[in-house]
């Protein structure tokens, strides 16, 4: 009976790729060959490929067997449970050991001999498939044993408590072991007023109240900041429309609050109440001669009440400091005048 699946060769016979030829056909090939029929005639008669017939006859002449498979039989299994156990022991003792080192140890310890020792690739496959998962599990278990127990988180009611019967119940909640006790100054009760400002929502009011009570220095409360409104500032005059006066009022409103440790508002002066700067005196571009021996000095446009043109600062010039050029000029002017006359 022909198989229900397979392929058809060039001779019209059916075969299954990858499957050995049935033993009955193998025996028939050997019988026909013993009768003296040529392999090509056996191939045509049994509709088996010529290569298959030649291979079966060659194996029969060498081994005397018509069975398929390896001639010498398969290699005996070397990865026995004992070998795998020793490999696991070596890997646990030295996690960084190589496959060739494990092979040498198997030979040195007498677990295997040179005929049945596994190859380096076989040892690598054992480490990857059979021992890899177990080693990871062992490392995870040891890590869990050495890992300290996680401490419980802080209770919610110790930080955020509310003015209700929950507050009393939260105050009685014992502190879990391993967590430091929270002092009363930190575990503050939070009160929620009727207003919905950012200061009240963030709880800055209660924090600043406790800090101001515990601090020896005076610090302004948040209530003073929140109560500060536009009605505390004087209204601008109707004629104050220009940007200068508006900017001055905005500066006063901006810097009206004094932070902790800074002087009060009274020490600041608004820009509008300051007098304008005096106009600088005009300097004459001309140079006036000074009697000082240092040379030429730029004189001012004004003159002292008791000074002269040569001495604007009202200082006396001694006679010994007179210059010869000035005397000669004076004498020359007198001579010219006399000649003209």
Swiss-Prot record:
InterPro entries: Homeodomain-like_sf, PAIRED_DNA-bd_dom, Paired_dom, PAX_fam, WH-like_DNA-bd_sf. GO terms for biological process: regulation of transcription by RNA polymerase II. It is found in: Nucleus. Its main location: nucleus. SUPFAM superfamilies: Homeodomain-like (SSF46689). Keywords: Developmental protein, DNA-binding, Nucleus, Paired box, Transcription, Transcription regulation. Residues 7-63 are annotated as: PAI subdomain. It comes from the Eukaryota. Pfam families: PAX. Residues 168-189 are annotated as: Interaction with KDM5B. Residues 82-130 are annotated as: RED subdomain. Coiled coil: none annotated. One of its GO terms (molecular function) is DNA-binding transcription factor activity, RNA polymerase II-specific. One of its GO terms (cellular component) is nucleus. Residues 4-130 bind DNA. Interacts with KDM5B. Transcription factor required for normal development of thymus, parathyroid glands, ultimobranchial bodies, teeth, skeletal elements of skull and larynx as well as distal limbs. PANTHER family: PAIRED BOX PROTEIN PAX-6-RELATED-RELATED, PAIRED BOX PROTEIN PAX-9. This is Paired box protein Pax-9. It comes from Pan troglodytes (Chimpanzee). The lineage of its organism: Eukaryota, Metazoa, Chordata, Craniata, Vertebrata.
């Amino acid at each position: 009976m022909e198989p229900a699946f397979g392929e058809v060769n060039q001779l019209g016979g059916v075969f299954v790729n990858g499957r050995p030829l049935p033993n009955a056909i193998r025996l028939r090939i050997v019988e026909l060959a013993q009768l003296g029929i040529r392999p090509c005639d056996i191939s045509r008669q049994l509709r088996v490929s010529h290569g298959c017939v030649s291979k079966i006859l060659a194996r029969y002449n060498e081994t005397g067997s018509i069975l398929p498979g390896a001639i010498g039989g398969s290699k005996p299994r070397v990865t026995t449970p004992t070998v795998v156990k020793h490999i696991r022991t070596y890997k646990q003792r030295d996690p960084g050991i190589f496959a060739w080192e494990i092979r040498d140890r198997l030979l040195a310890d007498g677990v295997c001999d040179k005929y049945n020792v596994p190859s380096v690739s076989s040892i690598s496959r054992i480490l990857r498939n059979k021992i890899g998962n177990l080693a990871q599990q062992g490392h995870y278990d040891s890590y869990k044993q050495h890992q300290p127990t996680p401490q419980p988180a802080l209770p919610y009611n110790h930080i955020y408590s509310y003015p209700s019967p929950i507050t009393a119940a939260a105050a009685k909640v014992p502190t879990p072991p391993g967590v430091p006790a929270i002092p009363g100054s930190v575990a503050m009760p939070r009160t929620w007023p009727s207003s919905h400002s950012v200061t009240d929502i963030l709880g800055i009011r209660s924090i600043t109240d406790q800090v101001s009570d515990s601090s020896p220095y005076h610090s302004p409360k948040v209530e003073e900041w929140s109560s500060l409104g536009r009605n505390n500032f004087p209204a601008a005059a109707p004629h104050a429309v220009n940007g200068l006066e508006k900017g001055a009022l905005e500066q006063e409103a901006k810097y009206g609050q004094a932070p902790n440790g800074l002087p009060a508002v009274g020490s600041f002066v608004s820009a509008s109440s300051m007098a304008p700067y005096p106009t600088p005196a005009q300097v004459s571009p001309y140079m006036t001669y000074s009697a000082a021996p240092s040379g030429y000095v730029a004189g001012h446009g004004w003159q002292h009440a008791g000074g002269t043109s040569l001495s604007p600062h009202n200082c006396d010039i001694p006679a010994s400091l007179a210059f010869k050029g000035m005397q000669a000029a004076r004498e020359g002017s007198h001579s010219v005048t006399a000649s003209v006359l």
